[in-house]
Amino acid sequence: VARNIPPAPGEPRRPFGPRDSGDAWVEGERGRFWGRYGAAGLLAWDPSRGVLLQHRAEWSDQGGTWGLPGGALHAGEGAIDGALREAHEEAAVPAGQLKPWVMSTFSVGYWSYTTVVAEVLAPFEPQMNDSESIALEWVPVESVSSAPLHPGFEASWPSLRPLLGRQPQLVVDAANVVGSRPDGWWRDRFGAAERLRDRLDALAVAGVAAEAASGLLWSPDILMVVEGRARGVSNSAHVRVVDAPGEGDNEIVDQVAALIAGQAKQDVTVITSDRELAARVEDLGGRVHGAAWLTERIDAVTDR
């Protein structure tokens, strides 16, 4: 059984607006944790400088240790939005210069903390915006474990470090996925492809659970290959659409080969139930999941 602990009189307030209802302790059988609706932190990684760490003020919980910018989520706020908001409030981190790609969640049932891992696309210098920090520094990856770390971050760092630099890519065989459900798609192939693109867009925002019970949700780059009468579908915020000039299978193989050759730590997964195409992708070093694997995850997001 969990219970909320009201804020103590005189606790420091946020510099941006009044205290939020999420700024409170939650207590249960696993201990006391900050954030009525859970909490989130940002692990910002700059390939040339390392990760951004916050030296926590002595008055704060686990004061004097090094950890991630972050804090309590607002009611109804997603982990990515919350982590970016907190990092901006505490360290002036510009959300537009980051690319979040994976979320790692620790949960005790009545409370959870999500680490949002993001790559820095354009360099920036953090600034201490409130009294929660003694210092903000870019720390080389190999030096992180040498610092006196916040216990939660210290426990999670060994599993977070291997995620740095990974670039998950999802390549979708649109014709195969659309054709896996007899919902009348053959009457309007273009419209069916647009609907799939929109559902993929929602999945990218919510995150893709790659493995059961892993605690990881990925935000991959999504490439959707269309063919025939489905050609001409436009890109969306999170989905890039490629028109296959001929057979979609050949275009998918070409795209996979280019992605794998482009960066050593890219993880390329193709969604198709076509066995011949799957074998060609695996020969290149890519992973393959069937259409049902994707539609189950899309349904879990879009049917909420």
Residue ranges and their predicted role:
Residues 2-41:
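Acidic, metal-coordinating catalytic segment for phosphate/diphosphate chemistry
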Residues 36-40, 112, 218-220:
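Short, basic and Ser/Thr-rich N-terminal targeting/leader segments
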Residues 40-44, 116:
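Short beta-strand scaffold segments in enzyme catalytic cores
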Residues 50-51:
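Entry beta-strands of beta-propeller and related beta-repeat scaffolds
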Residues 60-64:
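A conserved beta-turn-beta hairpin within the catalytic core of GNAT-like acetyltransferases
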Residues 66-76, 185:
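Short histidine-centered catalytic/ligand-binding loop motif
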Residues 72-164:
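Unchanged
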Residues 166-172, 176-304:
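Nuclease catalytic cores that cleave nucleic-acid phosphodiester bonds
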